[in-house]
């Protein structure tokens, strides 16, 4: 390997040592599409199981210190769930990251959320983000 290639490789390797990825909580649950769900025996079904799985991924990779949450799927009681989430963060050593609102599932979002033709729906979506 030529010196410049070696230096480029070392630079890339060093950058990867500090690279971090936020993993989505829903990546540990059953998955699917609008056409159906793909059920997996080991899929996480609670937020604690998701934190446990995220902790294992972070332990193996060292590059996933945060997990994005979904407001309806992970925080069904809204802000009342936050103390329990903080406990899970401490227990599993993974922090919460982005809190994603549900701006896609309901019928009102058939034509989008922030770009919906309805001013009322766009306004509601803006309040959620």
Language model segments and positions:
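N-terminal pre-domain/capping segments
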Residues: 1-128
């Amino acid at each position: 390997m030529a010196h410049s290639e070696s230096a480029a490789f070392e630079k890339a390797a060093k950058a990867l040592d500090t690279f971090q990825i936020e993993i989505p909580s829903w990546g540990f649950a059953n998955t699917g599409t609008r056409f159906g769900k793909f059920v997996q025996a080991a899929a996480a079904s609670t937020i604690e199981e998701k934190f446990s799985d995220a902790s294992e991924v972070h332990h193996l990779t060292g590059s996933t210190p945060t997990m994005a949450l979904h407001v309806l799927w992970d925080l069904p009681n809204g802000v009342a769930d936050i103390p329990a989430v903080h406990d899970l963060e401490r227990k599993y050593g993974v922090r919460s990251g982005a809190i994603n609102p549900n701006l896609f599932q309901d019928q009102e979002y058939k034509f989008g959320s922030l770009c919906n033709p309805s001013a009322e729906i766009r306004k509601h979506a803006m309040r959620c983000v």
